[in-house]
Amino acid sequence: MRNWRWLLLVLAVLLAWLQYRFWFGPGNSGEVMMLEAQVAHQTRDNEGLRQRNQALAAEVKDLKDGEAAIEERARSELGMIKPGETFYRVVEDAPLLPPAAQEAAPPAQPPAASADPVDHP
């Protein structure tokens, strides 16, 4: 009977020590939950970056393979035109009176858009 008490006491002490390590020791449950949250956050960040990389890779492939993408980018970002094309810039007429004077002035004809052709050889 005495041996059972010692065995029970040793098992209780062992259980208490294991519980202490589980809740408060290194690698405890709080740290594990915090690390799992960090992993989830990093996984979301990685997925966004993976999608961005795929889009950039598709753009690089398109620029390497097709002239249409290069031409479109040259036209929109650099303002380039093909030989023999005529570029038209539409400039709207600016009002001659300041805004306060416009309210007091009689209504004028609506401003007409003018087109200035620019020829490039």
From Swiss-Prot:
The chain crosses the membrane at residues 7-24. Keywords: Cell cycle, Cell division, Cell inner membrane, Cell membrane, Coiled coil, Membrane, Transmembrane, Transmembrane helix. Its main location: membrane. Residues 31-66 form a coiled coil. One of its GO terms (cellular component) is plasma membrane. GO terms for biological process: FtsZ-dependent cytokinesis. Residues 1-6 are cytoplasmic. It is a single-pass type II membrane protein. Residues 98-121 are annotated as: Disordered. The keyword Cell inner membrane applies. The keyword Cell inner membrane applies. It comes from the Bacteria. Residues 25-121 are periplasmic. It is found in: Cell inner membrane. Belongs to the FtsB family. Part of a complex composed of FtsB, FtsL and FtsQ. Essential cell division protein. May link together the upstream cell division proteins, which are predominantly cytoplasmic, with the downstream cell division proteins, which are predominantly periplasmic. This is Cell division protein FtsB. The lineage of its organism: Bacteria, Pseudomonadati, Pseudomonadota, Gammaproteobacteria, Lysobacterales. The gene is ftsB.
